[in-house]
UniProtKB/Swiss-Prot annotation:
The lineage of its organism: Eukaryota, Metazoa, Chordata, Craniata, Vertebrata. GO terms for biological process: Mo-molybdopterin cofactor biosynthetic process. Substrate binds at residues 109-110, 125, 132-134. SUPFAM superfamilies: Molybdopterin synthase subunit MoaE. This is Molybdopterin synthase catalytic subunit. It is an enzyme of class 2 (transferase). It catalyses: 2 [molybdopterin-synthase sulfur-carrier protein]-C-terminal-Gly-aminoethanethioate + cyclic pyranopterin phosphate + H2O = molybdopterin + 2 [molybdopterin-synthase sulfur-carrier protein]-C-terminal Gly-Gly + 2 H(+). InterPro entries: MoaE_sf (IPR036563), MOCS2B_euk (IPR028888), Mopterin_biosynth_MoaE (IPR003448). GO terms for cellular component: cytosol; molybdopterin synthase complex. Keywords: Cytoplasm, Molybdenum cofactor biosynthesis, Transferase.
């Protein structure tokens, strides 16, 4: 009966408010798991010698959520022991040092959760329709994700 109360769950969220590492990691904690692995992608203050002021993210929300759910399904097929998965991505303005994406995965042992987190971030960058604009001191640039399949279809 207790196992049912801790059935595997996926927590997907796109939000414009500041992301909380504590909140996201708490979502995946389970008494059945000895590992919680995290990836936190933050805004850095420079890119190729240019000073970054902040980032701005936009998404095709419904498709992004669908793709994020698909990533969770794929993780569960590849690593059946994974318990809970949380993928939270920020939209709008993300200041320097703040998180733009937090991924948390719990599993009984570390190998599965570490591998699953790596798969999640790599697949998210390659398949989820979220776009990043870097704002510099005197210009801005929409960033093409080299891993993104639709951006590279003509190459």
């Amino acid at each position: 009966m207790e196992e049912r109360e801790d059935a595997p769950k996926d927590f997907i969220k796109l939000k414009s408010e500041k992301l909380s590492v504590g909140e996201v990691s708490e979502l995946v904690v389970s008494p059945y798991c000895g590992a919680v692995s995290l990836f936190i992608g933050t805004t850095r203050n420079n890119f190729e010698g240019k000073k970054v002021i902040h980032l701005e993210y936009e998404a095709y929300t419904s498709m992004a959520e669908t793709e994020m759910k698909k990533i969770c399904r794929d993780v569960r097929q590849k690593w059946p022991s994974v318990k809970h998965i949380a993928v939270h991505h920020r939209l709008g303005v993300v200041p320097i040092t703040e998180a733009s994406v937090i991924i948390a995965v719990s599993s009984p042992h570390r190998a599965e959760s570490l591998e699953a987190v790596m798969y999640c971030i790599n697949t998210l960058k390659a398949s989820v329709p979220i776009w990043k604009k870097e704002i510099y001191e005197d210009e801005y640039s929409w960033k093409e994700n080299k891993e993104c399949f639709w951006a590279n279809s003509e190459k």
